[in-house]
A protein has these predicted regions:
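Short, flexible turn/loop "capping" segments at secondary-structure junctions
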Residues: 34-37, 119-123, 133-134, 190-194
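Alpha-helical structural motif
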Residues: 15, 54, 58, 91, ...
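Acyl-thioester-dependent acyl-group transfer interface
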Residues: 1, 5-32, 139, 162-238
Length: 238
């Protein structure tokens, strides 16, 4: 499915819309793009090549090499010091490696969730919303509520979406798909695509409070992130 290309990667100034097409049928191109805007480095990658973990590792190595070029005398540490890892380990198809025909599959029907609507950009372009959050304050709020930062932010986003729901659709649940790094559940060191997701949804009543949403999201995370459920969902992806 994937073939090696001896094509040099060229860094270019950012141009065009984010997440614009990388894969061009019948044309030999690389499935990733590196660009820059002022002091920001962008790395975009085709979803079949890697996931967020692999992309972040690549970007960190890229930045390290850039800093090494700019500051030759600097002694930068190894980012991922693992002498035992091989190229084959990093290219492993972990979905096939950890698929089990004996494990049960997890498929259940769910009520259609509320669909956000809005004005589309021309030519179906995408836009990016950047949000800077003070980590210490968020961590303190999450800790006080007895939840993780991920659970807290998930509940906050569900609550924010609820505020935009029209009255004629308040009976529909509000759902989010949360990515899950499967390397946390299987002993994989692959930098290839190896992630799944969980679906978190909440129903609202007239007296629903944010604390109720936090409690529901926390319980759903605990259930959906159990090893048995993750293994069943992995089999559905293969």
């Amino acid at each position: 499915y994937l073939e090696r290309r001896d094509i040099p990667a060229v860094v270019k100034k950012e141009a065009g819309a984010p997440c614009s097409g990388l894969y061009i049928p019948d044309k030999k191109t690389l499935l990733f793009r590196v660009s820059y805007y002022k002091n920001r480095i962008n790395f975009e990658v085709f979803h079949a090549l890697t996931d967020g973990t692999g992309a972040m590792h690549f970007l960190m190595e890229l930045v390290k090499n850039y800093l090494q070029e700019m500051h030759p005398s600097a002694e930068l540490p190894e980012l991922f010091p693992d002498e035992n890892i091989t190229g084959r380990d990093m290219e492993e198809d972990s979905f096939s490696q950890y698929y089990s025909s004996d494990a049960p599959r997890k498929r259940e029907s769910k009520k259609p969730a509320f669909q956000l609507k809005g004005e589309k950009l021309r030519q179906e372009d995408m836009s990016i919303t950047e949000v800077c959050i003070p980590v210490k304050e968020i961590h303190a709020r999450a800790k006080a509520a007895g939840v993780s930062i991920t659970v807290f932010l998930t509940a906050a986003l569900i609550w924010a979406i609820h505020e935009e729901v029209p009255q004629n659709q308040v009976k529909k649940p509000i759902g989010l798909m949360i990515p899950v790094n499967l390397r946390n559940y299987f002993p994989s060191r692959s930098m290839a695509n190896f992630f799944g997701w969980i679906e978190i949804s909440c129903y609202f009543q007239s007296d629903t409070a944010f604390e109720d949403i936090l409690k529901s999201v926390k319980e759903q995370f605990a259930k959906e992130l159990s090893k048995d459920v993750i293994e069943a969902k992995l089999n559905d992806l293969v």
